[in-house]
Amino acid sequence: MKSKVLQRFVLCITASLLFWNLNIATHASTLTPCENSAQFQARLNNNIKKLENKLTYYKQNSQEYTSIKQQIEKTKIRFDKYAKSSLLCGEDGLPHLITDGDWQHSGEFFIPSVLFIYIAGWIGWAGKGYLQYSKTLTKPNENEIIIDLPRALKYMFSGFAWPILALKEFKNGSLLASNDEITTSPR
């Protein structure tokens, strides 16, 4: 049963990718690749200059001096990564996230947001399972305050498959509460 649900899910994703128009929108005329942006370079130079000015307050080879030198290198590396990526910068010299459906920019917004939803769902699914387990005990409130770590870890490790488990529970009707279990306030 799980394999059929998974096959249908993969089929839906594949079909939507095949029929998706990848040239949905053009980028705003004010955005330029960060490597070509003069404001981006000015922002890099200003950041480096501020850090180098801080160096004058400390003795060479002191802990603070070394820390600021490392921060300068990290800043250069960060700006270099931005310049080499497909990020586009605005008139302010800052990289902008493109969320228009263009797959060239999927790493900027789409992939991180899907990962966020997956991780949030994983945590929620594990918490739901643990709370349902707690309700079966004689002192459920105590088990919510003093967490049974081995049991909680069991739910946490099994939660990675939460999308498939949620579909399974939805199909058999145990995911949603029935209407008679939902209370309504008098009006």
Curated annotation (Swiss-Prot):
InterPro entries: PSI_PsaF, PSI_PsaF_sf
Cellular localization per UniProt: Plastid, Chloroplast thylakoid membrane
Segments passing through the bilayer: 107-127
Pfam family name, one: PSI_PsaF
Primary location class: plastid
Membrane protein topology class: Single-pass membrane protein
Gene Ontology BP, a term: photosynthesis
Protein name: Photosystem I reaction center subunit III
Listed GO CC annotations: chloroplast thylakoid membrane; photosystem I reaction center
SUPFAM superfamilies on file: Subunit III of photosystem I reaction centre, PsaF (SSF81536)
Keyword field: Chloroplast, Membrane, Photosynthesis, Photosystem I, Plastid, Signal, Thylakoid, Transmembrane, Transmembrane helix
Signal peptide from the UniProt entry: 1-28
Sequence similarity: Belongs to the PsaF family.
Function, as annotated: Probably participates in efficiency of electron transfer from plastocyanin to P700 (or cytochrome c553 in algae and cyanobacteria). This plastocyanin-docking protein contributes to the specific association of plastocyanin to PSI.
Record has GTP-binding as a keyword: no
The keyword Thylakoid is annotated on this UniProt entry: yes
